[in-house]
Amino acid sequence: MTLKLNIDTRSWRNHIKELHEEFPGLVPVAKGNGYGFGLDVLAREAARLKDDCLAVGTAQEVAKVRDAGWSRDVIVLNPWRPFDETATVLIDDPQIITVVSRLEDLDELRKKHPRARVVAELMTSMRRHGITPEEIESVDAGSLGFEGWTMHLPLKGQLAEAKQLASAAIAHHRGAVWVSHLDIGDYRRLRTQLGVQTRMRMGTRLWLGAPQALSTTATVLDVHRITRGTRYGYHQARAPRATGRATRG
């Protein structure tokens, strides 16, 4: 009696394939509950498509996608912090790319894990975390495997912001540019203007962007008629009108 997600596999996979063709350098994101599909399902789909890199949210999710059969590179999107023991254990894994968002963390990794693969995160208008434009010139990767620069843009990606930040970053240390939330036109313009490898992280648009391929079903256990003003549910809200309340399994 559980809620079930039903997938029109052919339609869903066609959508995913089309996005891979439209966005060269696409990196699938598999994090949290796997956008409702499960991390194992997404890891297997990425492997089926022969993607070279999979993005996860946290270091703890690496084992889950590997258990599902993923055997290529993994970038951990949560920036590394010294207190994260799981992330620290993974740093020297040659297939792990660690995101670094503070100069002091970059310095520590350079000293203690000189062969680690890292991506430097830039501060955007999201104001989450990242190296500020003023700090870019202080970035010293040393012997680290520098995999480029990453930025987390607002849902409506800002091409001008992405170009400005990326241009300043690659002028200091040339490398790939990892972005999110740009539409296809802006992404192609950015690729052309920067002249470096670009990677597009994609989660929601990739996995949930074909709603016609998805449907849900559930078992209805009871239907109760309630009158206007009757309290119901955990929060005891009042019914705005006479209606039926379904209880599903």
Predicted features along the sequence, with ranges:
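Active-site anion/phosphate-binding pocket segments in diverse small-molecule metabolic enzymes
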Residues: 5-8, 13-16, 28, 80, ...
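Active-site-proximal beta-alpha core segment in soluble small-molecule metabolic enzymes
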Residues: 3-7, 11-13, 24-168
